[in-house]
Amino acid sequence: PAEAIWSRSVDAEPTAVCQVEGGFCFALRSRGVYRMDIEAKEIWRASMPSVIDGKRRGQETAISMSVSGEILRIWFDNGLVVDLSMEDGSELDRRNLRVGERIEAVFHSKNEHLLALSTGGIARTNAEQVLESHPTSGPVMAARYQDGAWEFTGWRIDGRLFEGILEISKRTEIGVGFVGQRVLTNDGTLADFPFTRS
């Protein structure tokens, strides 16, 4: 694009991206993981971690990335979590979070994460194990961590998870994101989030 600061073409679909100190990292489907500096110069590239779960070999997708200290964490839709070194992209650790279904999205806070599951439902994790899970009446589209609670919106629902207690409120439209303290819905409206913070 004419007004871009920089642009690069890629030969596969980007499936996850995250900001890191001095640049960003991204994953390309079936290709690999890349760390770039702020000028889009490659710092390192690593092969996509091999994924074996017996059912969908080769079809898993890296859907999210997060950073914890010097670790780049890759989250896959089948529950696999792979830790890579921020220094050189080498694999440090891997584990499988047992959630029972495909993960649609991962929302991150400093010390924990919220998984949005494909048929509705959420699971809270510390990236090592699932701490709790709850069904929802539809898919969760957006979530954020505020004042010790997870707040989320989605398919005709808003919700709040605080100290193991899940509160749900139904809505007419589909919540697709948060704008400040309000919910953006699929019809372009900004609506109030129904839960007040303590």
How does the language model describe each region?
Residues 60-146:
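Eukaryotic tandem repeat interaction scaffolds
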Residues 29, 38, 42, 46-54, ...:
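Repeat-unit-sized solenoid/scaffold elements
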Residues 2-4, 12, 16, 27, ...:
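A sequence-composition feature that detects small, non-aromatic residues
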Residues 6-85:
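Solenoidal tandem-repeat scaffolds enriched in leucines and small polar residues
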Residues 1-7, 34-51, 80-96, 120-138, ...:
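Surface-exposed loop/turn elements that mediate protein-protein interactions on large endomembrane-trafficking
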Residues 1, 22-27, 33-34, 70-75, ...:
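Short beta-strand elements that form the blades of beta-propeller/WD-repeat-like
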Residues 9-21, 52-66, 98-111, 136-149, ...:
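Repeated scaffold domains used in trafficking and secretory/extracellular systems
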